[in-house]
Amino acid sequence: MLSHDWTDNRKNLMLFSGRAHPELAEQVAKELDMHVTTQDAREFANGEIFVRFHESVRGCDAFVLQSCPAPVNTWLMEQLIMIDALKRGSAKRITAVIPFYPYARQDKKHRGREPISARLVADLLKTAGADRIVTVDLHTDQIQGFFDGPVDHMRGQNLLTGYIKNNYPDTNMVVVSPDSGRVRIAEKWGDALGGVPLAFIHKTRDLRVPNQVVSNRVVGEVEGRTCVLIDDMIDTGGTVAGAVQLLRNDGASDVIIAATHGVLSPPAAERLAQYGTREVIVTNTLPIGEEKRFPQLTVLSIAPLLASTIRAIFENGSVTGLFDGEA
């Protein structure tokens, strides 16, 4: 039930959506019992993007929701243009809601003469006029420090672990991290699933080849257990496919894959469908068309989490409280 203050102030909250994932925006609007503000958005013949809102935005608390699937640059630019239009239309506060933060894997320099593109994205959002960012499961936590303003880093863990607990009760599980760097997150998953043990994949990455990972060996006991293999995203599926093969070779009885972001670039669907996983669970932070779906895929809605976050920000409540101090 929405509070009395929420009802009185609802006219000040406005939700805007880019064209990348309108279904998610409509789900969020439904959770908030409001509508997505209408707009004209189109490309000129040369590909330049134009945006104009149909109603006054003066003094509003604006939330601009845009996911960034392929083509990433198009949708990022559209969100920047929307934010600029809101700033020039005298919106009181502008929050960029970016469920999947673009360029998050370029968060540091691996070698000389490389960009830090995740920082550049943060600078672009600030320059366009964003006062705040809401995002979900960043590739690395340090990206929060790239933006000069509040960053609400939400977690999909509760949604994913809740689904697993409900659908796999009394299962002999082990949580598997795809690499040693995500063991701390795997520990939180283990606690959320009732104190199950952990394992991780030792792997190496060829920095010269995108999306190329070599999985070497499993560290931990997985024989006879159902492995819950976790990651922040599944892109081409190369990392998880190699990990599934290793886990099977080490005697795992079943493998469930859980990730927040289903990028699912080709040939991910084919790989994941043929590697003998029991279920692949992702959220809808990104649109997942029919061409990316396969029988083992389950897509959970992140809309309730985003709506709760928007509500908390609008009412000046605690976003951290949504995660019992873990946000």
Curated annotation (Swiss-Prot):
Alphabetically ordered keywords of this record: ATP-binding, Cytoplasm, Kinase, Magnesium, Metal-binding, Nucleotide biosynthesis, Nucleotide-binding, Transferase
EC number annotated for this UniProt entry: 2.7.6.1
Cofactor: Mg(2+)
GO terms, molecular function: ATP binding; kinase activity; magnesium ion binding; ribose phosphate diphosphokinase activity
Reactions the enzyme catalyzes: D-ribose 5-phosphate + ATP = 5-phospho-alpha-D-ribose 1-diphosphate + AMP + H(+)
Catalytic residues (positions): 203
The protein's enzyme class: transferase
Binding site for Mg(2+) 1: 139
Subunit structure as annotated in this protein's UniProt entry: Homohexamer.
Protein name as annotated: Ribose-phosphate pyrophosphokinase
Organism of provenance: Mycobacterium leprae (strain TN)
Lineage of producing organism: Bacteria, Bacillati, Actinomycetota, Actinomycetes, Mycobacteriales
